[in-house]
Amino acid sequence: MARTLMKPDDVKGAWAIIPTPAKDDASDWRATKTVDLDETARVVNGLIDAGINGILSMGTLGEAATMTHDEKLDFIKALVDAAAGRVPIFVGTTCLNTRDTIALTRQALDIGADGTMLGVPMWCAPSVDVAVQFYKDLAEAVPEMNIAIYANPEAFKFDFPRSFWAQVAEIPQVVTAKYIGVAHLLPDLAAIRGRIKLLPIDFDYYGAARMDESIDAFWSSGAVCDPLVTTTLRDLVSQARATGDWSAARAFMGRLGPTAAPLFPNGSFKEFSTYNIALEKARMNAGGWMNAGPVRPPYHLCPEPYLEGARLSGRMWAELGKALAAEK
């Protein structure tokens, strides 16, 4: 049976981006079948029960670059089975070339994933023409698969310029994008003309929502440190939109914002990107809501002071979650 594609307006609220839970031996290159499938199911159910609107997976912190093909298929099946159609599940299928990406995306579709979170092949830094054609080819090959563009310039050696957004907005399968920063948000929104729902990170959501009414969804890796923090942000911004009173949302950002600082070594996104996986998993493990497990090689090495900053970030997020629960 043919599936109906999502529309940008179908993407709303708080979307959690999750790690791929790893078994205890996952940092050993000899390890096989490293995905903790039981923890995967528990996390998906916990996020849905907490009110999360959608789930993104198998990005950078999701270790798509270091999972085996069989592990990816096992993880996708665990995600889809646990969600059971209750929220959209987008899975990363980016590979180093178009044909492998198409093959994995077809397999994800057959398993039941709702969409792919798709970056661009990065062995050679892509030109705009190459990047746009990559998405066009994927949409032609797997026309029933929704696409979330994974716009991470550090990971993919690509700046995702305005000319790129203007062209991919013409692809019906491209319904949303995991978006970073707000410096270019307004011109990028003008380029996409309402055809793609841009998702800023949780720390930018308040500011982005104040800038443009179309910003009514965001992504959050902190959701797996405690989803109550993420859903509280969503609900406070929604209430502010309804009432015109942004004071509570602004005050909440004063509590949420400081949790980000320790995550970024020397305040640098570039430095963070070098150790992204190890830092995010350290943060999540310290948060205590889930067991993200160890990091798969070769990205399991990270300076200890950087890891301690990430752990502090996770503990701060978790403490905020406990405070919010006590205030209810």
Curated annotation (Swiss-Prot):
Keywords: Aromatic hydrocarbons catabolism, Lyase, Pyruvate. Inhibited bye p-chloromercuribenzoate and salicylaldehyde. Activated by salicylate. It comes from the Bacteria. Its EC number is 4.1.2.45. Optimum pH is 8. It is an enzyme of class 4 (lyase). Pathway: Aromatic compound metabolism; naphthalene degradation. GO terms for molecular function: 4-hydroxy-tetrahydrodipicolinate synthase activity; aldehyde-lyase activity; trans-o-hydroxybenzylidenepyruvate hydratase-aldolase activity. It catalyses: (3E)-4-(2-hydroxyphenyl)-2-oxobut-3-enoate + H2O = salicylaldehyde + pyruvate. Signal peptide: none annotated. Gene3D superfamilies: Aldolase class I. GO terms for biological process: naphthalene catabolic process. Involved in the naphthalene and naphthalenesulfonate catabolic pathway. Catalyzes the transformation of trans-O-hydroxybenzylidenepyruvate (THBPA) to salicylaldehyde and pyruvate. The reaction is reversible. Can also use 2,4-dihydroxybenzalpyruvate (2,4-DHBP) and 2,6-dihydroxybenzalpyruvate (2,6-DHBP). PANTHER family: 4-HYDROXY-2-OXOGLUTARATE ALDOLASE, MITOCHONDRIAL, DIHYDRODIPICOLINATE SYNTHASE. Homotrimer. Belongs to the DapA family. This is Trans-O-hydroxybenzylidenepyruvate hydratase-aldolase. The gene is nsaE.
